From Swiss-Prot:
SUPFAM superfamilies (UniProt xref): Aminoacid dehydrogenase-like, N-terminal domain (SSF53223), NAD(P)-binding Rossmann-fold domains (SSF51735)
Family under the similarity heading: Belongs to the Glu/Leu/Phe/Val dehydrogenases family.
Lineage: Archaea, Methanobacteriati, Methanobacteriota, Thermococci, Thermococcales
Residues involved in NAD(+) binding: 219-225
InterPro entries: Aminoacid_DH-like_N_sf, GLPV_dehydrogenases, Glu/Leu/Phe/Val/Trp_DH, Glu/Leu/Phe/Val/Trp_DH_C, Glu/Leu/Phe/Val/Trp_DH_dimer, Glu/Leu/Phe/Val_DH_AS, Glu_DH, NAD(P)-bd_dom_sf
Entry superkingdom: Archaea
Protein name in UniProt: Glutamate dehydrogenase
Gene name linked to the record: gdhA
Dependence of activity on temperature: Optimum temperature is above 95 degrees Celsius.
Length: 419
């Protein structure tokens, strides 16, 4: 488990970025606090006839740049501090991507693994009834996150529409929906595809040709699998190692993404894949590869192993895989980190495209969506990279400077703060 309080980390990162910016004390004070926190109690009738009361949250961190945007997490250990931190990070993520959004996040303390589909539906609808007054297509737009999925989003959207009597473009109140109810087809691989564009641009910045180069991917869920598939099939890279929570596999000649996925589905893990050597998650991180993509959990690159990282590019598909101490070590070693809230922003960017289509009624092809995503990710990468070069600071600090500057400007233009 993560030791530090998540919201304290978020505030520290903001304070660190402020050192490299011309930002007033009052603006910084404002940015250290969420604009709105909603806590709700949701009574849900369980299948056995009993009623269980769940606690839910919705945090709208900052709406200077537009409606707040962010996922809904269902987790037995959900805390308000985590939701606040993630809402702050969503604020910077939408700003670094230059999307017309602020940042938000929601959560419910529950264990979905122990709930039936009927119970989940009742909880989803109850949550929407509880937070109905603070969400809409123009104020706060939720999406799926930990243990929530397109089906749960469809129930939530339906409940919102039932209450609102379809008075606004209600498909646009929630993103990450099934395509049959206004969802976007390109959402499935959006996070990995967005990350692949940033890796391509990082390689250009380093003068590296990706064809034939090696990549190791920690985590083989949605993002890890699609990252392996895209980097090998579209960029000609060799995926030499992948892992999941039970361990990893290594093959210097390269692994086939689809075959490994089929093996994982059959056995429950990538481990023992035919023709590959079993390795630990720790060993995977320290392999001699060109690109390392931590795509699983937080805080895996720490001061203990940072010195042993040999990759030239670290692409953070996971949230917070590198600790601040490790950041410094990797920067000193000349390793280029593509920070999480830039690298994994493909998901929220395609969510934005879904929302635009729901509001306008204009639906795009997968090819059009990918071309627009490419353009957005490429511009965001160079905005951050150029700031990193100009200010001589690491990529994470540069991403914060770009993002916070944009939110700060919007706050000044609105007259919320005078300087």
């Amino acid at each position: 488990m993560v030791e530090q309080d998540p919201f304290e980390i978020a505030v520290k990162q903001l304070e660190r970025a402020a050192q490299y910016m011309d930002i007033s004390e009052e603006a910084l004070e404002f940015l250290k606090r969420p604009q709105r926190i909603v806590e709700v109690s949701i009574p849900v009738e369980m299948d056995d006839g009993s009623v269980k009361v769940f606690t839910g949250f919705r945090v709208q961190y900052n709406w200077a740049r537009g409606p707040t945007k962010g996922g809904i997490r269902w987790h037995p250990e959900e805390t308000l501090s985590t939701v606040k931190a993630l809402a702050a990070w969503m604020t910077w993520k939408t700003a670094v991507m230059d999307l017309p959004y602020g940042g938000g996040k929601g959560g419910v303390i529950c264990n979905p693994k122990e709930m039936s589909d009927r119970e989940k539906e009742r909880l989803a609808r109850g949550y929407v009834r509880a937070i109905y007054d603070v969400i809409s297509p123009y104020t706060d737009i939720p999406a799926p996150d930990v243990y929530t999925n397109p089906q749960i989003m469809a129930w939530m959207m339906d409940e919102y529409e039932t209450i609102s009597r379809r008075k606004d473009p209600s498909f646009g109140v929630i993103t990450g929906k099934p395509p049959s109810v206004g969802g976007i087809v390109a959402r499935m691989d959006a996070t990995a595809r967005g990350a692949s564009y940033t890796v391509r641009e990082a390689a250009k910045a380093l003068g590296m040709d990706l064809k034939g180069k090696t990549i190791a991917i920690q985590g083989y869920g949605n993002a890890g699998y699609y990252m392996a598939k895209i980097m090998s099939e579209e960029y000609g890279m060799k995926v030499v190692a992948v892992s999941d929570s039970k361990g990893g596999i290594y093959n210097p000649d390269g692994l086939n993404a689809d075959e490994v996925l089929a093996w994982k589905k059959k056995t429950g893990s990538v481990k023992d894949f035919p023709g590959a050597t079993n390795i630990t998650n720790e060993e995977l991180l320290e392999l001699e590869v060109d690109v390392l993509a931590p795509s699983a959990i937080e805080e895996v690159i720490t001061k203990k192993n940072a010195d042993n990282i040999k990759a030239k590019i670290v692409a953070e598909l996971a949230n917070g895989p590198t600790t601040p101490e490790a950041d410094e070590i990797l920067y000193e070693k000349g390793i280029l980190i593509i920070p999480d809230f830039l690298c994994n922003a493909g998901g929220v960017t395609v969510s934005y495209f879904e929302w635009v289509q729901n509001i306008t009624g204009d639906y795009w092809t997968v090819e059009e969506t990918r071309a627009k995503l490419d353009k957005k990710m490429t511009k965001a990468f160079w905005d951050v990279y150029n700031t990193h070069k100009e200010k001589n600071i690491n990529m994470r600090d540069a991403a914060y400077v770009v993002a916070v500057s944009r939110v700060y400007q919007a706050m000044k233009d609105r007259g919320w703060i005078k300087k």
